[in-house]
């Protein structure tokens, strides 16, 4: 382990509510501090999300912390997100502890005694502090849920253990920003209130000059300085943490725009890794719609069945909703059907769960659009993988997170040849393509991140599709995000909070 040559005071980014933008603020700050030459790392004690990824050493953490590590230019580790809760029912979740599946817990069971989870989180926090000069800590939900406060080890307890300066993030777009900030500060204990050193107002729309008086009023009412008002900005593609913002985009009334490739994605109750579709959502030549309720799909050229944290349960929902009829009609009309991970399993003939991995044991007969059968095994498979699309020289990069082992019949051929897993040479195959090429399944999450791979898939549906002359990469997106925040933050105050020598400011 390399000992940091300099240490700075940690920053904790806590929120007045869920989905106020804590993850994006933490990501921006990671890149801002990295650009100042600081060895910075992200940390979130507990994350509730079905958007997860795989670290280089084969462990599972939230996608948001992987994105933050990328922004900080450090290798993601399980210590950056020691407790990951992956909801698999309305009242329960799989617990991933320091990168490994630990147990399935009901909400009541999990919160009955959080000491085990809190101790693991504390161990990871201390290890990260020993390895890096600065930690940017992200809280969870509202930091002022007073009924949960004694058991909340993610927000102020973490801030106290890290001796962190707290920045409170509020979302002005949802309204009530004064009540958000002042109300939060009013209900938390005085010793925690004393840790709050600044407020960031996120997602401002319009002319920020019109809010200048509001800043003065908020500072007078709260006694805490406003570090910045961040305008609403959509021009970067960075992985989201959960499906809260996604729910606002489901079942749009309008059809896909003329001249664009229309892509429909089924919005399962337990959808997971919907970040797989981010490259499509941010492609100006694509219209992506998430659909919860079935409807005729003739206006679309591609239908995607994304990942699911409860595959058999979500397939039962799909049947009950009447989706089978629309999927089959779309396939028979020549549409391109793509399944990713759980969606891939649903495209096959059956999914067997003899061990009750996702709930009640049993076997579910599925769509039968691919000649495959899937067995859910007790051990979860995790890997960062690299492949080459069959019949091309196009390289694909992705990560695998699945309990399913899928066997393939004779009338299908592989989607890609696997050449490496976890940086070790590999000779294997992934995925399935139907005989006519209109149904494709893969276990690769992040399959569309590589522009050439995205182009290959979309050209199977629309031969006229071409990539934009300049597609922004992830690192460029982090720079764009950091620049946006620097323009609207009091950077001097920000660096002052971490005890950074002002003469060294970039």
Curated annotation (Swiss-Prot):
One of its GO terms (biological process) is cobalamin biosynthetic process. GO terms for molecular function: ABC-type vitamin B12 transporter activity; catalytic activity. Gene3D superfamilies: 3.40.50.880, P-loop containing nucleotide triphosphate hydrolases (3.40.50.300). Pathway: Cofactor biosynthesis; adenosylcobalamin biosynthesis. It comes from the Bacteria. Residues 260-453 form the GATase cobBQ-type domain. Keywords: Cobalamin biosynthesis, Glutamine amidotransferase. The active site is at residues 341, 445. NCBIfam families: cobQ, PRK00784.1. HAMAP family: CobQ. Belongs to the CobB/CobQ family. CobQ subfamily. Catalyzes amidations at positions B, D, E, and G on adenosylcobyrinic A,C-diamide. NH(2) groups are provided by glutamine, and one molecule of ATP is hydrogenolyzed for each amidation. This is Cobyric acid synthase. It comes from Chlorobium chlorochromatii (strain CaD3). The lineage of its organism: Bacteria, Pseudomonadati, Chlorobiota, Chlorobiia, Chlorobiales. The gene is cobQ.
């Amino acid at each position: 382990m390399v000992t940091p040559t300099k240490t700075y005071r940690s920053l904790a980014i806590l929120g007045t509510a869920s989905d106020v933008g804590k993850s994006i603020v933490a990501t921006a700050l990671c890149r801002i501090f990295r650009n100042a030459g600081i060895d910075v790392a992200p940390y979130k004690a507990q994350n509730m999300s079905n958007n997860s990824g795989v670290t280089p050493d084969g462990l599972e953490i939230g996608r948001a912390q992987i994105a933050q590590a990328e922004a900080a230019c450090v290798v993601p580790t399980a210590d950056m997100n020691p407790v990951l809760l992956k909801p698999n029912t309305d009242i329960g979740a799989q617990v991933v502890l320091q990168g490994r599946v630990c147990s399935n817990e009901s909400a009541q069971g999990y919160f009955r005694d959080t000491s085990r989870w809190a101790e693991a989180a504390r161990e990871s926090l201390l290890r990260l502090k020993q390895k890096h000069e600065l930690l940017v800590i992200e809280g969870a939900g509202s930091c002022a849920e007073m009924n949960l406060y004694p058991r909340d080890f993610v927000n102020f307890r973490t801030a106290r253990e890290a001796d962190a300066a707290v920045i409170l993030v509020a979302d002005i777009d949802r309204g009530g920003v004064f009540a958000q900030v002042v109300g939060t500060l009013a209900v938390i204990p005085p010793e925690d209130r004393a840790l709050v050193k600044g407020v960031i107002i996120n997602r401002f729309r319009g002319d920020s000059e019109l809010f200048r008086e509001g800043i003065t009023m908020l500072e007078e009412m709260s006694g805490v300085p406003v570090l910045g008002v961040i305008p609403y900005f959509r021009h970067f593609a960075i992985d989201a943490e959960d499906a809260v913002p996604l729910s606002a985009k489901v079942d749009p009334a309008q059809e896909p725009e003329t001249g664009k490739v229309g892509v429909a994605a089924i919005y399962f109750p337990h959808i997971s890794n919907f970040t797989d579709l981010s490259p499509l959502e941010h492609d100006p030549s694509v219209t992506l719609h998430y659909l919860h309720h079935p409807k005729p799909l003739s206006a679309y050229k591609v239908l995607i069945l994304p990942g699911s944290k409860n595959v058999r349960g979500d397939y039962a929902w799909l049947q009950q909703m009447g989706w089978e009829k629309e999927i089959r009609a779309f396939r028979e009309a020549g549409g391109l059907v793509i399944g990713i991970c759980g969606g891939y399993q649903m495209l096959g003939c059956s999914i067997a769960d003899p061990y009750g991995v996702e709930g009640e044991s049993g076997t579910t007969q599925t769509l039968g659009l691919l000649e495959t059968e899937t067995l859910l095994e007790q051990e979860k498979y995790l890997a960062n993988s690299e492949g080459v699309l069959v019949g091309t020289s196009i390289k694909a990069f992705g990560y695998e997170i699945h309990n399913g082992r899928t066997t393939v019949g004779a009338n299908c051929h592989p989607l890609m040849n696997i050449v490496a897993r976890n940086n070790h040479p590999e000779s294997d195959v992934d995925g399935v393509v139907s005989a006519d090429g209109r149904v494709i399944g893969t276990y690769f999450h992040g399959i569309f991140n590589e522009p050439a791979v995205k182009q290959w898939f979309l050209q199977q549906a629309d031969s006229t599709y071409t990539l934009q002359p300049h597609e922004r990469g992830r690192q460029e997106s982090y720079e764009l995000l950091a620049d946006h925040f620097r323009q609207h933050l009091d950077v001097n105050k920000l660096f002052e909070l971490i005890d950074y020598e002002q003469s060294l400011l970039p």
